[in-house]
Regions:
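Non-heme di-metal
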Residues: 1-319
């Protein structure tokens, strides 16, 4: 009989990067429910009203980007997979983007009141700079070429998130909100793999283009980055001018914009390097976690769940 549908065979790998990425992502699987966020409540109460407002807004913005990535971003690049294993990796990425988006709600429910949470989401869903970057990226997801979609995804994963990531990393470096920052470090660890992987898949397609097409496409890539950077500068000023961190955040953004370009196999655009970034924040960006140990309750990484033997009554569902 003619083959109607093919089973995926993980014993026949066409691209070793698919397998190594799958293994990396599954190895670092995590859930927000395993982080003891309530341990940060003492730190939270000591923050000023302005600082609390900043934290709420940056996490609102990050929630929006992760929501878009989980709903339309991964779907947009799924149609152009080269191997069935690539599609499996994208399934994993899509699920983890949903975990990331949910994690911010876990932070909100721990630190904020119901009315504060409502205000955060109201701000997020109406902020002009957030909505502008969402529109720029999502328009490409809906109307761009397969290569353009991969560029948009890599810019989002490796560049646009970082105006928000700066805040928790800064507090972590100052011994505040350590468990909130632990979630952010876990998210950064995921996004680092996502951006590298999708950038690699982009390079495979880009390198197949004739030289002239590469030149015009490269122009489009840098134009898009400039457009996003200009909007991100306005967004950053609106968030950080009040606490005086704007210039440091912009340096951090330029550094990560260069990383996004390098993931895509392109030359960096900005002069900023890791040495220019606030060392406290740079230290926090390392993709290890403070205590990624399922068998320990020491530190601020994963906590061991409480296990008890099953009883007969446990099987009386709804009785």
């Amino acid at each position: 009989m003619e083959t109607y549908y093919k089973a995926i065979n993980w014993n026949e790998i066409e691209d070793a990067i698919d397998k190594s990425t799958w293994e990396k992502l599954t190895e670092q699987f995590w859930l927000d429910t395993r982080i003891p966020l309530s341990n940060d409540l003492d730190d939270w109460r000591k923050l000023s009203a302005e600082e609390k407002d900043l934290v709420g807004k940056v996490f609102g913005g990050l929630t929006l980007l992760d929501t878009m990535q989980s709903q339309t971003g991964v779907e947009a690049i799924r149609a152009d997979v080269r191997t069935p294993h690539e599609e499996a990796v994208l399934n994993n990425i899509q699920f983890m983007e949903s975990v990331h988006a949910k994690s911010y709600s876990s932070i909100f429910s721990t630190l904020n009141t119901k009315s504060e949470i409502e205000k955060i989401f109201e701000w997020t869903n109406s902020n002009e700079y957030l909505q502008t970057k969402a529109k720029i990226i999502n328009d490409i997801y809906e109307n761009g070429t397969p290569l353009q979609k991969k560029v948009a995804s890599t810019y989002l994963e490796t560049f646009l998130f970082y105006s928000g990531f700066f805040t928790p990393l800064y507090y972590l470096g100052n011994n505040k909100l350590a468990n909130v920052a632990e979630i952010i470090k876990l998210i950064i660890r995921d996004e680092s793999v996502h951006g590298t992987y999708i950038g690699y898949k982009f390079q495979l397609g880009f390198n197949e283009l004739p030289e002239k097409e590469q030149e015009s496409f490269r122009e489009w890539m840098y134009d898009l980055l400039y457009q996003l950077y200009e909007n991100e500068e306005l967004y950053t000023k609106s968030l950080y001018d009040g606490v005086g961190w704007t210039e440091e955040v912009m340096t951090f953004l330029r550094y990560n914009a260069n990383k996004a370009l390098m993931n895509l196999g392109q030359d960096p655009l900005f002069p900023d390097s890791a040495n220019d970034v606030n060392p406290i924040v740079m230290n926090g960006i390392s993709t290890g976690t403070s205590n990624h140990d399922f068998f320990s309750q020491v530190g601020n990484g994963y906590l061991l769940g409480t296990v008890e033997a099953m009883q007969d009554d446990d099987y009386n569902y709804g009785l």
